[in-house]
Amino acid sequence: IWKGLVGSEMCIRDSLGVACGLLFLLNADIALASDDQISNANTAWILTSTALVLFMTLPGLAFFYGGLVRSKNVLSVLMQCFSLACLVSIMWVAFLYSLAFGDGGSLNSYIGGLDNSFLAGLSASSMSGDIPETVFVMFQLTFAIITPALIVGGFAERMKFSSMFIFSFVWMILVYAPICHMVWGGGLLGEMGLMDFAGGTVVHINAGVAALVLAIYLGNRTGFQTVPMPPHNLSMTVAGASMLWVGWFGFNAGSALAADQSAGMAMLVTHIGAASGSLAWMFREWSRSGKPSVLGIVTGMVAGLGTITPASGFVGPMGALVIGTLAGLICYEATQYIKNKINIDDSLDVFPVHGVGGILGTLLTAIFASSQFGGLGMENSISDQFLIQLFGVVFTIIWCTIFTIVAIKVAEIFTGNLRVTNEDEETGVDISSHGESSYN
């Protein structure tokens, strides 16, 4: 009897061991299956990057621009940045995400469709690669938010709020969504092989060109080149610039859409580009004017960051050093040329910093992405890739110019003259447009 009981106990124990082993293997298979669907590490990084990129606009860019304008116009700039963040968010949910990343059918080379309007079909379990699609939607939304906010610097201190609002609504449909789709959403430029890691064309060239067109169309501010218009609060500008620098790590490294080697390299070269751009601008200004300025070093930082953006996922540290240095030097000269030689009042230098920087960075990507120059390598030869990059730059400039003018004309239909009156400009847009003053 005793031997029988012991034998039965051993049999039960062995059976339990086999069962536990099977359960362990089953759970491991389930875990592996889950890992194939979602990467918690990648998701956590893109969530963080999303917050960083939104932080670039609110409050980073708002403070950066706010400090650069005169004290009577600071609230207008903050209001424009804040309201655009809200407007673009609703538009993104309603139809912009669908236009940018949806299937456009016969027009897919240029624009997506409306099948995903109001995020139709999106659920908590929807996936985009190995991250939830909800995270991808939100990440891309932050890029859409900052682009029209950058344009604000081109017409600062002289455009009606109502005109700005309607213009931005139309511009996002006609310019941002199509270019975003063509580069990142499976459209023409991406299929051609254009290399734009984080928005040289989509964000910076678009914003720079639109700002230049608006600056020319609106005309110069009253007193431009005859009345001093110094920044009213450089401390605010430096605070905003610092926020932009930190937020840009999410902008560029987050565009890897993964917490991997590509993101690590993108973060490193982003920092190098910012630092080298700052110093290049500072030394060039120092040699020209005899003094290095705070405004100069932070503007050089933005130029370096904007220029490294399209290249950030493709180049190595030495390439970033060259790109950032060229950004500081060339964008500085572009700023002087536009303001002092051809007398265009791009109020906060959006085109020479972001437009020229985006063009320069997109073209230089073809060179420094090559393994010959320390890059991560590419399929095409340098010459072939350069032609693709050049086509992408020219195409984006032409598209943006044409449809920015269309957006201006549409805004004029609803608001008449886009510009505030001379009296309102003299009083300040804070009081005349918003009935408030930043300093009491």
Where is each model-derived feature located?
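Single conserved hydrophobic/aromatic residue that forms the stacking wall/gate
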Residues: 1-12
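Sec-dependent N-terminal signal peptides
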Residues: 15-20
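C-terminal segment of classical bacterial N-terminal signal peptides
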Residues: 23-30
